[in-house]
Amino acid sequence: MVHFTAEEKAAITSLWGKMNVEEAGGESLGRLLVVYPWTQRFFDNFGNLSSPSAILGNPKVKAHGKKVLTSFGDAIKNMDNLKTTFAKLSELHCDKLHVDPENFRLLGNVMVIILATHFGKEFTPEVQAAWQKLVSAVAIALGHKYH
């Protein structure tokens, strides 16, 4: 289990309160699909994913990205119990969707980059470290069913 300090929790929740989940979520998933094109195979029903502009403008990518980032709201509310919080999503992604758990780590890293671009100077090294810790812990929780 990962322990978050009071300072880390404050850094995460402060930024979360200012985040445009729809915009950052769509951009995060879109960038994942552009930078790691093999991840597109899990989104066959999303329509046109033929180019970066098609991916980033795709309404299904944006909608699912929002859904993914919204689940981080659950992580933020339950930072001390991520394994339980993501148990059902872990089972879904493992048993039904057969998603490579490495993709969770990749998406987390893309999310951190997107946050940095959205928040600029406010995204200090301390804030980055806290968010990196969170996305890593969420990736581990989502991959739990695989072990």
From Swiss-Prot:
Domain of life: Eukaryota
Positions of modified residues (Phosphoserine): 14, 51
GO biological process, one term: hydrogen peroxide catabolic process
Tissue distribution: Red blood cells.
CDD domains reported in the protein's UniProt record: Hb-beta-like
Gene Ontology MF: a single term: peroxidase activity
Keywords: Heme, Iron, Metal-binding, Oxygen transport, Phosphoprotein, Transport
Residues that coordinate or bind heme b: 64, 93
Start and end residues of each Globin domain: 3-147
A Pfam family reported for this protein in Swiss-Prot or TrEMBL: Globin
Family membership: Belongs to the globin family.
Function: The epsilon chain is a beta-type chain of early mammalian embryonic hemoglobin.
Subunit structure, as described in the record: Heterotetramer of two alpha chains and two epsilon chains in early embryonic hemoglobin Gower-2; two zeta chains and two epsilon chains in early embryonic hemoglobin Gower-1.
Name of the featured protein: Hemoglobin subunit epsilon
Gene: HBE1
